[in-house]
């Protein structure tokens, strides 16, 4: 089986689509079938690897990159419509 998603760090709660995925496509991660995507996801975009509650941080590269603004279910697209910058993440 050819992977269609990539987990960058073992602590990440999102994975990256290696190709455009359509709703219902099965994620193949680490050469195993994993779960279905819940909506169309563009190549290079994030997919929730697990359920993420509102206010929880989204981890990529093992670091918090954004915070969920609503519950995000496993298999959903993680993007600007359901996340915001991590409060206090940027100092000027």
Locations of the language-model features?
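N-terminal small-residue-enriched
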Residues: 2-92
């Amino acid at each position: 089986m050819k992977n269609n998603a990539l987990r960058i760090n073992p602590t990440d709660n999102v994975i990256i689509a290696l190709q455009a995925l359509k709703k219902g496509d099965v994620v193949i991660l680490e050469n195993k079938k994993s779960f279905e995507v819940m909506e169309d996801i563009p190549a290079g975009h994030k997919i929730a690897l697990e359920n993420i509650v509102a206010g929880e941080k989204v981890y990529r590269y093992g670091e918090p990159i954004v915070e969920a603004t609503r519950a995000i279910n496993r298999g959903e697209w993680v993007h600007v419509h359901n996340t915001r910058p991590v409060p206090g993440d940027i100092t000027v």
